[in-house]
Amino acid sequence: MCKSKCVSLQPEFEQNPQKIVMITSFTAENYRSIDGEIRLSFKADTGIKDMDNRGYTTVANTHVLNAKAFFGANSSGKSNVFKAVGMMRGIIIHSVRLNDNETLPYDAFLLSDEEARPTRFEISFVDGTDKFTYGFSYTAQRIEEEWLIVKFPKRSLKTLLRRTPDLIEIDAQNYPEGLSIKDGTIPLNNNRLFISLAAQLGGEISKRVIEWFRTKPNVISGLQDNDFSHYTKEMLHTRADYKDEILYFIGSMDVGFREVITQQEYIDEKLLPKGLPAEIVASLKEHPPIVAYAKHEKINADGEVMGVVDFDIDERESDGTRKLFNLAGPIVDTLRQGKSLFVDELDAQLHPLLSRRIVTLFNCAETNPHGAQLIFTTHDTNMLSKKLLRRDQVVFVEKTVRTHYSTKLTPMMSIKFDNGSKPRTDSNYEKNYLEGKYGAIPYFEDEFEGCNE
């Protein structure tokens, strides 16, 4: 299946060898609708053979999934799982800028009688042959705990850092960059992450962790994809090495055009609204907006091409086409650089076949040679197909009285029916899900049987 369909999707995508870097797990606790600990595993279950095209990349002797799909009712907390990833990333990246009197972005579960309980995040990833696990817990006022665990080739697992409110422990032999912070030579504020300070001081291991968070994971809302419009436009305008791949991606989706031209607008201060803050004016002049035009063929009654008309993509294209255009830059960049892309509501405004095509790009080794990952939420039950997703790539999300209105994750691989059986390879996953056999669907108090009742 993969070899017959995937090679033709992106024949010009770069195949340069590079180090594979992938997320293997993520854990969150006490964040928004998440009360108790939830854990996402991206390790593949190699015992299942659901698809011909594998759907995973082998790195550091670990089989890691290239895609993961989250299904669940509205208000189940799917978005909050992705926001947790974004929050962890944001705290790490911005920790270096915090003054000692600033608070941390604490957004705990509100339906618990345990007040001021720390929020906790942890992520594990493989970076080439090295394995990292990093996490921390915090309240609005301080970092409560912090830990860094690594596994280098032919060496045992090492806990390099363990921080509590009363104690900081480091592995001096394997993590000497932390010594000056531990002994107090370099002061560490209560609201600042240890590895952030260590990286600022030049610590090589800490810099690797910070750089991974800065460059590899990216979280996008499929309902607010306009934020990434400039991302795609700038790539088309300034990155000739990306332009062909982005245009091929767009053209392969059958949206009515294959060519896009970009133009940087001239900013005339005289035409700007009066009273606009000086910093905004300066920013507009330094980074003028880029306009993208789709080139549409003009056809006569005989089907002959009579010319080309330029459509301003933001003004004249449909919502779905604009979304696909906005996502094109992040998707191509993720595939090319082997990053991890989290997309909330991937299917919103897209035809089901377009969503499936995007997932297939990540699941096929031919179009995803660098171990890129696509993690997404969706309401499109057509994706619950064994031809598209492996069973270990599917997670169901629910929030009910049984879960005390806290978000709960149930991987399809962990589902057990009353008779002790599990979902079979030959099951109709979509039908079973809509019938409630896997949970994570809306339940109505009354059956609606007709419009006359």
Per-range role (PLM):
Residues 3, 8-10, 18:
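Short, positively charged and aromatic/hydrophobic N-terminal segments
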Residues 13-87:
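Pre-Walker A-like glycine/lysine-rich segment at the N-terminus of P-loop NTPase domains
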Residues 17-25, 357-453:
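C-terminal lobe/lid and adjacent interdomain/linker elements of RecA-like ASCE P-loop ATPase modules
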Residues 29, 228-316, 429, 437-438, ...:
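Extended helical coiled-coil dimerization/tether regions that scaffold
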Residues 31, 345-350, 381:
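Conserved Walker B
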Residues 55-69, 73, 82-134, 139-143:
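Conserved P-loop NTP-binding catalytic core
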Residues 67-74, 278-332, 340, 346-353:
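Conserved ABC ATPase signature
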Residues 133-271:
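Electropositive, glycine-dotted interaction segments
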